[in-house]
Amino acid sequence: MAGLALSATTAHADEGMWTLYNLPQAVYEQMQAEGFTLPYGSLYSNPDAIKNAVVNFSGYCSGVVVSPDGLVFTNHHCGFEGIRSHSTVDHDYMLNGFFAKSFAEELPNENMFVSFMKEQKDITAHMEALRIHDWSNARQEEMIDSVANAMTDSIKKIDPTLHITVEPFYEGNKYYATTYQDFTDLRLVFTVPKSMGKFGGETDNWMWPRQTCDFSVFRIYADPKTNGPAAYSKDNVPYRPKHWAPVSMDGYKDGDFAMTVGYPGSTERYLSSYGIEEMRDAQNAPRAQVRGVKQAVMLRHMRASEAVRIKYDSKYAQSSNYWKNSIGMNKCIDSVGIVQMKRDYEAKIKHYQDSTGFLKGRLNIKHLGDLYANRHKDMKDMLLFNETFRRTNELTSRAINFAQGLIAVKNPKAKAEKQYAMFDDNSDTWDADLDREVMAALLKNYAEHVDKADLPEFYNDINTKWGGDYQKFTDYLWNNSILMKKKAKIFVNSDKVKNDPAVKYGEQLLTVMKNLHKKLAESIDEIDEQERLLCEAKVRMEQDMPHYSDANFTMRLSYGQVGGYLLDGKPSGYYTTAESIVEKMKRGKENFEYEAEPIMQELMSASDFGPYTDKTTGKMQLCFLTNNDITGGNSGSPIFDGKGQLIGLAFDGNWDSLSGDIWFDSKLARCIGVDVRYMVYLMDRWGHADRLLEEMGVVKVKKGF
């Protein structure tokens, strides 16, 4: 047990999400032994370093530059909101796909960007000189922001297009400063139809075998004079990157070296056994339950209306992804016995502490368990509140935002009685019938899972005035609140607004939310400090071994091999083929998530795939498995071979990897990637995107077919 527990955060075999600027030499040498052929400097420091081709995609995914004119590959689900924003019932790019036949046809996107990491360095000594650990969490965050702002101000004097963030690593035992350059003129160039980009939908999400062609293509535009970042302008030109990833058509075989570089969002592998119990019981379980209720309503409305589907496809996908993740993670926690493994390992740390005196009087693992036990109910109630009331329907979102004062007064210099606020018209992003039904269903569900004494005041009205009918209460608010009137002036100081039913509803929700935050604040600082010390003790106990920090949406490298695993006791295989997607397409009438257009069925049923056929297997390969260490945020991460060439994009993990955020098991956890040859095949044979193929340097493949 202890040996297994050790692998939770100490690097064994190919485990780890490594920062590139200080990659341990031992890790690099292991990469070489497994097939990486490039010099150490090719990862971070050289002008043509791999880091210069990898981007943070819009703050939630990863991507890779693949051409000298700034083409970016990312996942279809990462670009999905951009695709949705351009879609209408008449021009449904989500459903039917899109290809810009010229630069002029490439579509700009609001609120999307790519960010290049320019530099990273350790500033722990500076933060410790500020005695950062002497302060509360809230004060620590203020100090981190202050340092980052000061560093940004300094670097902007040298280059105004740069900014710096400061992040804690190793549970706050280290601090790194990272310099970024953001490009905000990002345009949609190519996307496959939803039938292929989301093939298998929720049925296949987190599952293997997989056939999804999960990719989309964007282009970075830059200032024509400086090649630097610029706000959108028709005068901007394609960005000329320092380095781009060469696209490989050579494929891979079982055991080949594979490396991901991207932006994993969050892991908690140093988390205590008590923290894992809380995650399982007070977070994952209620999250899955509430989202199940919400998603059932959403899906029914989406299936009934194309217009509603366009509005909610992205919202549904985001919700259902972590609904299924929560279910799978809990099953893995229990089936693997992770809590007990962690408990056994904590006993080992306690023995080390007792024998050495390290952190004596500071780290108290038993006390940490008591702290978690005392806040369990409040944490679960907070999760239920957030899943029920935060961003689940338009009225509740507006009510809470208004109560928090987040809607700016339009005329602050006017007399108090004349001051008004106004909500932006976002009616193209929501549907009243769907939102009303979701709101009523979640109100009812919340009452069934929270103690009566902890419910907001308006539940008394639901029972006394509305006879317990949640839909009638919901409809009353929607029909009678000024918050839902399009372009209405909301005179914030008027008695009418103060007595508005949805305004009161929002204020009562805010009261509950503040009370929950207050309760949780009583223990959060002490819990976080004990978790930090637990991490410090672990690293000290294993100081002769390399350690990687938990993911925090900074660039990380993971290396491993192409290969399958045992799935239900049988070999899983390490790739899928065109034949397998055709078999699923035949079941489209039984499961709408396997439906595909006739042209896609024809393309995937071809008798000869020409140069897209794998030379080793003789098959057209679609998706493949590696044991790279990934998590959310790695979506769109390039998968490189040992020569630094692009062989695919990471887009998912398997069901058995769902405890990977807290525990990595290289025998079970797998990264699912979409084969770049599959991507190029559809760009070629479906999209006829010759100009993009030539731009990426795969024109010879096109002509050879």
Please report, for each region that a protein language model flagged, where it lies by residue.
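Bacterial N-terminal signal peptides
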Residues: M1-S7
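Terminal presequence/propeptide segments associated with secretion/organelle targeting
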Residues: A8-F705
